[in-house]
A protein has these predicted regions:
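Outer-membrane beta-barrel proteins
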Residues: 1-342
C-alpha cells in the first residue's frame, strides 16, 4: 500500500492542471558508519560492524490551493527512503517498507486563524526541540537515542497558530486518536489504551533567540503517561557576541508508563561556522537518568562532528560519538558521508 501511495503521489506531481503544481523536494544523506560495541550484559558479546546508513533520507510532495481569499488547502506527502537497503526483507529477500510515511497530511490554512492539519505528523512536544539537537540528522547519534518522546504519530489532528498578536510566539496542539475501543484497557498497565493522546507546545523565535516548552500526555507509541521539555538556543552572532556560534540546551522529564521512576534528561550543544570557510564544527553532550523509567539505568552521549559545504545543495559530514549505557553497553560510532538536498 505504501508503494502504491508513493506511485500515486508521483503521478500527481506529473499532471498539468489549472491548480498549482506540487513542489517536489527531498534529500539523501548517506554515510558509512563503523560501530564498536562493548557489551556489559550477561551474554558479554562484543561486536564491531561497518554499514551504510540512510539517515532519514526522504522524498516529498507539498502544495496549496486557494479556496477563498483567506483560506487555502494545504497538503504534504513525505516518504522516508532507505537508500542503502530495504527497511525489512521477507524470507525471499524481497524489499518490504522501502518507502515509509513521514509527515503526511492534508489541512486548511487561514490567513489570521492558523492552520488545521490531519494525518501523520510529529507531535508538538517533539517539534519543541527546534534546532537544539545538532546531531538530529543522523539515525544512530543524537537525542532520539537516549530520550523517549521523539514521536511521529498516526491519526493526528493538529492546530498551529499564526504569530500571536504581533509577538513572535506560536502555539501548537494535537490530539492523537487512539484507534481503540474507548473502553479498552489492558489489565495491570498504566496505559489507557482507549483514550486519545494529547500534545502541545509554545515557542518564541526572534533575532536568533529560540525558547520553547512542550508537553505530552498518554502518547502510547512512546509509552509515556506524561512528559515535558524546555528547549532553547541562541545564535551568538545575532546578539553581537560570537559570529557563527550557536549554543543550545534542553531539559526533559518523562513519566514512563508502568515504571516507578521518572526519566530525566538534559542536553547541551554548540555549533560553530568557521568564518568565511566552508567548514562548520559541532559538539553535543546528553545525560539521561533512569532511562526508560528503570532506576539507576543511566546513559550518556558525547558527540563531535564537522560539516563541509560544497555548494547550496551538497554537504559533507564527519562525526564520532561515544554512547555509554549502564549495565548494557559502551558504544563507539564513527561515520562520514554526503548529503544532497533538492
Amino acid at each position: 500500500m505504501k508503494k502504491i501511495a508513493l506511485v500515486s503521489a508521483i503521478a500527481l506531481a506529473s499532471i498539468t492542471a489549472a491548480h498549482a503544481a506540487p513542489t517536489v523536494y527531498g534529500k539523501v544523506l548517506l554515510t558509512g558508519e563503523y560501530t564498536d560495541v562493548d557489551d556489559k550484559t550477561a551474554t558479554n558479546k562484543d561486536t564491531s560492524t561497518t554499514q551504510l546508513v540512510s539517515n532519514s533520507s526522504r522524498i516529498g510532495f507539498k502544495g496549496e490551493d486557494d479556496l477563498t481569499d483567506t483560506t487555502k488547502l494545504v497538503y504534504q506527502l513525505e516518504y522516508g527512503i532507505d537508500v542503502d537497503a530495504a527497511s525489512n526483507q521477507d524470507s525471499k529477500g524481497k524489499d518490504k517498507n522501502q518507502f515509509y510515511s513521514r509527515n503526511t497530511y492534508i489541512g486548511l490554512a487561514h490567513n489570521t486563524m492558523g492552520t488545521l492539519l490531519a494525518g501523520r505528523h510529529d507531535t508538538p512536544f517533539k517539534l519543541a526541540k527546534g534546532g537544539v539537537d545538532v546531531f538530529n540528522d543522523y539515525d544512530n547519534v543524537g537525542l532520539g537515542n537516549l530520550m523517549v518522546g521523539e514521536t511521529r504519530a498516526n491519526n493526528v489532528i493538529a492546530y498551529r497558530s499564526p504569530t500571536l498578536v504581533g509577538v513572535p510566539v506560536t502555539f501548537m496542539a494535537a490530539a492523537v486518536l487512539s484507534e481503540e475501543d474507548k473502553d479498552a484497557d489492558v489489565a495491570n498497565t498504566d496505559i489507557d489504551e482507549g483514550a486519545n493522546g494529547y500534545s502541545a507546545s509554545l515557542a518564541y523565535d526572534q533575532n536568533g533567540v529560540y525558547l520553547a516548552a512542550g508537553y505530552d500526555n498518554n502518547i502510547r507509541s512512546s509509552k509515556t503517561d506524561s512528559a515535558w521539555r524546555l528547549a532553547g538556543s541562541v545564535d551568538m552572532g545575532k546578539i553581537n557576541m560570537v559570529p557563527g556560534f550557536t549554543l543550545g540546551a534542553l531539559y526533559q522529564e518523562t513519566d514512563v508508563a508502568d515504571k516507578s521512576e521518572d526519566e530525566k534528561s538534559w542536553l547541551v550543544s554548540g555549533k560553530y561556522k568557521i568564518g568565511a570557510t566552508p567548514w562548520a564544527v559541532k559538539a553535543q553532550y546528553i545525560d539521561t537518568s533512569n532511562r526508560s523509567g528503570v532506576k539507576d539505568n543511566d546513559a550518556t552521549e558525547v558527540a563531535l562532528g564537522a560539516e563541509y559545504t560544497i555548494n547550496k545543495a551538497t554537504k559533507g559530514h564527519l562525526y564520532a560519538a561515544q554512547i555509554d549505557t549502564d549495565n548494557v553497553s559502551d558504544k563507539t560510532i564513527v561515520g562520514g558521508g554526503l548529503e544532497y538536498k533538492f
